[in-house]
């Protein structure tokens, strides 16, 4: 037994040092380092602890054999992701934890920005994934006014924020996964509210400070459009912009900056409040919503990364549709298997919720306990992976066909019906998410290959993967509008977490072209959340180049090729084998 344990731990350490196996590159935000090694080894121990001590044997076997994926097992004692109330931070200050240094509420812009950085860094240690604030520009604008700041002074503080959030600050040598949502135009639900400065309400209203909000937006965009000294993009915070009816007519000078950043790096995420049925005010609605109607699914406020105030997810389980299609052989048996594994997912999420509530009550999440106190407004999240491959397996046609579209729409609607039943049974919130599946799609494919001879997979024999959620095959088309049309109904069937990435071979020629494209997508489709994602390359010596350039044309050195892995920009060299193959096979759109 001792010899076996020694060999197991030796293999575990060697796996990371050699960067071998899917677990070694499970998260491209974690950089190769001693801290990464410690994270890798401890994550394996904590993951095993969770599977054997928290979850049922049925859930453990379903996960181990690839029927489901229980996300972030290393963080099984804490929640998945969270959106926070910036207003509460500005009112209360930073602290509330016994034995830890506390600060008074911010009286000045520089202090407020510093508190945001502190808060995100600390909360990222208490949760598995993304941490988000909404209305960053609106809520901090009054501080700029009362401090009588020049634009240069605002720029300096925003520059500090961006650089601070791009430094590793958690085990695994990870940058804090953070999102800031910018209103662009003062949000109607905040416009008539009294501003918070220095921990107290003042007589002034937020609608009076659009000019200062514009300064904050300009400063942020001018920082990120330059990148770092070598031309690398800033991965975090992920900026989300709310596209409302006046979005394209407001802030003339900032429009050019925003779409220069979009054309060059593709950093901004766009939340579509024009073509979709989303409500901009819902971002803060969960804070005071005490009585949920569990007879229907509600759309989770925010989006995949930018969760609404005081909401988020306690945990995520993804279902392997490809495996169920392979074993089911026909649609009726497929649905029966789906129902079975949805129940297993539900049971595991109910366990997770109880564990997180206990962790918070016992002080394992001390800052979350102070600022949140409960996860009653946090969702239990279920997602799917391999929808395209499931179509091929069941009906011999992929997701781009009418038959494939019909099958997956029926599947998603069936899942939603089951989630309503779960809500009625548990009195907890459930949602259906197009989960990112950064490592899950590769892990599922490896296990499908192991257990299911002849099963349909994307990629190659050496680097297989499943297509994310119910997305189109990555090599299906370079026609953007065809792809958008085929994703319109599918993406709006989910209740959270959908993103459509407009992948481009290189940056767009000018900002006006980017603006026109974003406007057209927002006005003519129902897609809730989308990005423009150009490919670009960075040489440590000679800077940035358009498109995929693996060798620097000036010095001949290796470059870093950048694109989005499921939702954030990272060098392709940091991706796992499955996602790397997906990048190689992907057709970029012509615009």
Can you annotate each of these PLM segments?
Residues 2-376, 397, 401-554, 558-561:
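Conserved catalytic cores of very large enzyme subunits
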Residues 130, 321, 376-381, 566-572, ...:
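Generic secondary-structure boundary/loop-capping signal
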Residues 540, 555-591:
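Long, charge-rich boundary regions
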Residues 391, 448-463, 568, 572-575, ...:
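Contiguous hydrophobic segments
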Residues 154-158, 162, 393, 570, ...:
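Metallocofactor- and cofactor-centric catalytic cores in central/energy metabolism, strongly enriched
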Residues 378, 382-391:
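Extended amphipathic alpha-helical segments enriched in small hydrophobics
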């Amino acid at each position: 037994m001792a010899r076996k344990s020694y060999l197991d731990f030796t293999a575990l350490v060697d796996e990371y040092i050699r960067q071998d196996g899917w677990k070694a590159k499970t998260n491209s935000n974690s950089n190769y380092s001693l801290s990464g090694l410690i994270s890798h080894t401890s994550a394996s121990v904590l993951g095993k602890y969770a599977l054997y001590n928290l979850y049922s044997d049925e859930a453990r076997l379903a996960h181990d054999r690839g029927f489901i994926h229980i996300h972030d097992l290393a963080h099984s004692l804490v929640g998945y992701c969270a959106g926070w109330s910036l207003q509460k931070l500005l009112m209360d200050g930073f602290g509330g934890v016994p034995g830890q240094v506390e600060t008074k509420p911010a009286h000045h812009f520089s202090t407020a920005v510093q508190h945001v950085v502190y808060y995100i860094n600390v909360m990222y240690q208490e949760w598995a994934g993304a941490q988000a604030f909404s209305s960053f520009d609106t809520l901090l604008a009054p501080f700029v006014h009362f401090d009588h700041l020049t634009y240069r002074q605002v720029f300096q503080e925003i520059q500090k924020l961006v650089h601070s959030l791009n430094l590793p600050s958690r085990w695994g040598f990870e940058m804090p996964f953070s999102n800031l949502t910018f209103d662009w135009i003062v949000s109607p639900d905040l416009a008539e509210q009294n501003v918070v400065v220095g921990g107290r309400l003042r007589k002034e209203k937020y609608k009076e400070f659009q000019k200062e909000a514009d300064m904050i937006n300009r400063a942020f965009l001018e920082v990120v459009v330059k990148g770092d000294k070598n031309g690398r993009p800033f991965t975090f915070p992920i900026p989300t912009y709310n596209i409302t009816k006046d979005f394209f007519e407001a802030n003339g000078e900032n429009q050019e900056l925003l779409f220069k950043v979009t054309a060059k790096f593709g950093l901004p995420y766009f939340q579509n409040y024009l073509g979709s049925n989303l409500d901009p005010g819902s971002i803060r609605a969960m804070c005071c919503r005490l009585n949920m109607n569990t007879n229907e699914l509600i759309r989770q406020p925010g989006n995949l990364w930018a969760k609404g105030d005081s909401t988020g997810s306690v945990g995520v389980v993804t279902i392997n549709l490809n495996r169920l299609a392979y074993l089911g052989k026909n649609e009726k048996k497929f649905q029966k298997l789906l129902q079975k594994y949805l129940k297993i997912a539900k049971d595991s999420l109910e366990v997770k919720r109880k564990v997180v509530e206990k962790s918070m009550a016992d002080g394992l999440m001390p800052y979350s306990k102070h600022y949140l106190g409960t996860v009653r407004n946090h969702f239990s999240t279920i997602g799917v992976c391999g929808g395209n491959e499931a179509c091929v397996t069941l009906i011999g046609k992929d997701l781009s066909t009418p038959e494939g579209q019909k099958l997956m729409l029926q599947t998603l609607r069936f899942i939603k019906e089951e989630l309503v039943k779960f809500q009625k049974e548990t009195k907890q919130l459930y949602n259906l998410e197009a989960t990112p599946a950064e490592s899950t799609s590769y892990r599922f494919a490896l296990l499908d290959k192991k257990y299911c001879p002849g099963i349909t997979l994307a990629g190659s024999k050496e680097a297989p993967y499943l297509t994310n959620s119910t997305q189109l095959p990555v090599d299906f088309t370079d026609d953007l509008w065809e792809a958008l049309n085929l994703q319109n109904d599918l993406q709006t069937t989910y209740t959270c977490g959908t993103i459509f990435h407009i992948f481009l071979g290189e940056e767009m020629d000018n900002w006006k072209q980017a603006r026109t494209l974003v406007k057209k997508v927002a006005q003519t489709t129902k897609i809730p959340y989308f990005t423009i994602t150009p490919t670009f390359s960075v040489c440590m010596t000679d800077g940035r180049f358009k498109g995929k350039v693996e060798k620097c044309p000036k010095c001949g050195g290796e470059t870093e090729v950048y694109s989005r892995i499921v939702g954030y920009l990272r060098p392709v060299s940091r991706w796992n084998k499955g996602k790397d193959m997906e990048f190689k096979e992907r057709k970029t759109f012509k615009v």
